[in-house]
């Protein structure tokens, strides 16, 4: 019975990673095979309003591997998979107001650094 729980957990983890990857490609960018480098790109939605808003987009380092048994024993909540990654984030930005009341961050520099969305 315990074997089936572990097997189900691995399947669910794999499925969630696949879904995360699938949803991280907006508007048909899934068809591109290579991943562009981390750099400034113009936001196409705000470009329609005539306002040049730039965002950091691109790929950085990411990998996942099985957690070593020795490390798993010391965890408060043992996890079977360990991941390491860096994300394309803004090194510098300027706060701008668009359409009178919408406040945005217009990125001016990008680099690969800690993934802030992973931190809770």
From Swiss-Prot:
Belongs to the glycoprotein hormones subunit alpha family. Keywords: Disulfide bond, Glycoprotein, Hormone, Secreted, Signal. InterPro entries: Cystine-knot_cytokine, Glyco_hormone. Shared alpha chain of the active heterodimeric glycoprotein hormones thyrotropin/thyroid stimulating hormone/TSH, lutropin/luteinizing hormone/LH and follitropin/follicle stimulating hormone/FSH. These hormones bind specific receptors on target cells that in turn activate downstream signaling pathways. Glycans are attached at residues 80, 106. It is found in: Secreted. Its main location: secreted. Disulfide bonds join 35-59, 38-88, 56-110, 60-112, 87-115. One of its GO terms (molecular function) is follicle-stimulating hormone activity. This is Glycoprotein hormones alpha chain. Heterodimer. The active hormones thyrotropin, lutropin and follitropin are heterodimers composed of CGA, a common alpha chain described here and a unique beta chain which confers their biological specificity to the hormones: TSHB for thyrotropin, LHB for lutropin and FSHB for follitropin. The lineage of its organism: Eukaryota, Metazoa, Chordata, Craniata, Vertebrata.
């Amino acid at each position: 019975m315990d074997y089936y729980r572990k097997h189900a957990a691995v399947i669910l983890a794999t499925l969630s990673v696949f879904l995360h990857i699938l949803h991280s490609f907006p508007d048909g960018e899934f068809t591109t095979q290579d991943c562009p480098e981390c750099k400034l790109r113009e936001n196409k939605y705000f470009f329609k309003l005539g306002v040049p808003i730039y965002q950091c987009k691109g790929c950085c380092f990411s990998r996942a591997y099985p957690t070593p048994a020795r490390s798993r024993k010391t965890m408060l909540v043992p996890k079977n998979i360990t991941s390491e990654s860096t994300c394309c984030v803004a090194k510098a930005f300027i706060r701008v107001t668009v359409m009178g009341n919408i406040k945005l961050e217009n990125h001016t520099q990008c680099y690969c650094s800690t993934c802030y969305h992973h931190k809770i």
